[in-house]
């Protein structure tokens, strides 16, 4: 029997394991049976309560008006595991043809359901388009489709609760957020205003590292602060998408496999292949 070939040049990171499917929002979604009127009215009341509390928090801040939030973070909680949140309805942009599109509301992070907690999705709703977001739920109550079902049924029926967003909802690293230390703020790069960013960091006396990283559509800003100060950033116009624990690494190999993949995909998007017959230089280090 021939000897098995040596494949030392291949590295297998981890092994195959069975996991429940967590990606949802694409295609058909099982719809949770609920009482239409009771459920719809309760969700509208919860959304209104979050918006009202957010406005009270802004009014109590001693900040320049320019440093106050121009949108509200909401956390949508699912019900049973079988009825996933309709994630593809949680991002909507304006439909301008000649001017850049602006977000009406954006899906930021998703926490899959576990044995102890239901699925949670954190979104950001622009102040300018609050009324359109609430209209999704009002239409659910009053408008029927041609199939005699509530409009936006798959979206609204599968949301069990709507609540204010806290640090834990934006935190995507393992474990609990620290009380003090370094934090990686992931910002939506297209909406970052560098001057505004510097003013917010100065207003809350946050120490910024010299290291800034761009990956795909995200700008990662590393800051040193207490947990209390980080919580205040939710009430500012910074376009936060998630908050992570920083990775202090000496080399690319120190990154996790998923983090390496992010950097490789980002590099691939920025590299153009040379044409056939182009000069080739071999650099030996």
Give, region by region, the residue ranges found by the protein language model.
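Calcium-regulated, polybasic anionic-phospholipid
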Residues: 82-95
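Acidic-leg catalytic submotif of subtilisin-like serine proteases
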Residues: 266-285
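Autoinhibitory propeptides
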Residues: 1-56, 97-185, 191-270
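Short glycine-/aliphatic-rich beta-strand segments at the starts of folded cytosolic domains
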Residues: 60-85, 171-189
